[in-house]
Amino acid sequence: MKTALVIMAAGIGSRFGGGIKQLAAVGPNGEIIMDYSIHDAIEAGFDKIVFIIRHDIEEAFKEAIGDRIEKICAGLGVEIDYAFQALENVPEGFSVPEGRSKPWGTGQAVLACKGIIKEPFAVINADDYYGKEAFVRLHDFLQGYTPDKPGDLAMAGFVLKNTLSDNGAVTRGICQMNDAHYLTGVLETSGIEKTA
């Protein structure tokens, strides 16, 4: 069964002086975090990659990663597609409040994929590293998807202290679960720092 990896890469990048933070080199040969995530996902069995970006960063994004990844993936039989997050893309019956200038975030980003994704999929942030094991577990879960159980969902959660940076405060989604281990909410929390 085909499985897709959706990579949210539309971040404004204000922490990087207005640049595209997802394109910052971290590896010894200029690799970016997405290179590692895409490699791990393909190794785990994902065969479609969908980048969620903004129209205004499309050219820079494709120059920095998209075109290169498309060439690599073409030789591996992995499909590449793009979805575009835009402020005005809201569900039918809704409108953008007057004065709002920024897109809505994760939910709206995933909504941008409507019509592009037909297969089971996983969603990741472009600038977070998840590790091979997370992609293997997600792919294995998605392989068990059946259309008669469309509500089957999974989340690769991480212990908060293991996701903190040595280089200052971070923002994380703190997941809340009920007694049956179902996700009941996500609280976006800013300014989280390691303590001694």
Tell where the protein language model's regions lie, with residue ranges.
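Glycine-rich N-terminal loop/short-helix segment of MobA-like nucleotidyltransferase
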Residues: 1-28, 44
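Conserved N-terminal catalytic core of the sugar/cofactor nucleotidyltransferase
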Residues: 2-7, 31-123, 130-131, 135, ...
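Short beta-strand/turn micro-motifs composed of small residues
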Residues: 9, 27, 53, 125, ...
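Active-site metal-binding loops of divalent metal-dependent hydrolases
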Residues: 12, 127-128, 160
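Short glycine-enriched, charge-decorated loop/helix-capping segments at active-site entrances
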Residues: 20-26, 96-100, 170
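Conserved beta-strand segments of alpha/beta enzyme cores
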Residues: 22, 79-81, 182
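Residues that form or immediately flank small-molecule/cofactor binding pockets and catalytic motifs
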Residues: 28, 85-88, 188-191
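Conserved core of the sugar-phosphate nucleotidyltransferase
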Residues: 132-196
